[in-house]
Amino acid sequence: MSDKNIRITQVRSIIGCTKKQKATIKSLGLGRPNYQVEKPDNPCTRGQVKVVQHIVKVEELS
């Protein structure tokens, strides 16, 4: 496993999103615009980000 992390920032509100997208945002630890979390860079996290890619911004950390 790599020790790389990604920083996920919520840039848009979840108003008008589907239930699946709202649940994904909550499971990532986000909830309001400008909230940030750092998660390990693995396929599971990348899959969650892909579901809500129009709501979040992703930065790779070293």
Swiss-Prot record:
Q: Transmembrane ranges? A: none
Q: Which InterPro entries match?
A: Ribo_uL30_ferredoxin-like_sf, Ribosomal_uL30_bac-type, Ribosomal_uL30_ferredoxin-like
Gene3D superfamilies registered for this protein in UniProt: Ribosomal protein L30, ferredoxin-like fold domain
| Coiled coil spans | none
Q: Which UniProt keywords apply?
A: Ribonucleoprotein, Ribosomal protein
Keyword Ribosomal protein in record: yes
- Which CDD domains does this chain map to? Ribosomal_L30
Q: Which GO terms describe its cellular component?
A: cytosolic large ribosomal subunit
What Gene Ontology molecular-function terms does this entry list? structural constituent of ribosome
Q: GO biological process annotations for this chain's record?
A: translation
Q: Name one Pfam family in it.
A: Ribosomal_L30
State the family named in the UniProt similarity comment for this chain: Belongs to the universal ribosomal protein uL30 family.
Q: How does it assemble?
A: Part of the 50S ribosomal subunit.
Q: What is this protein called?
A: Large ribosomal subunit protein uL30
Source organism (scientific name): Prosthecochloris aestuarii (strain DSM 271 / SK 413)
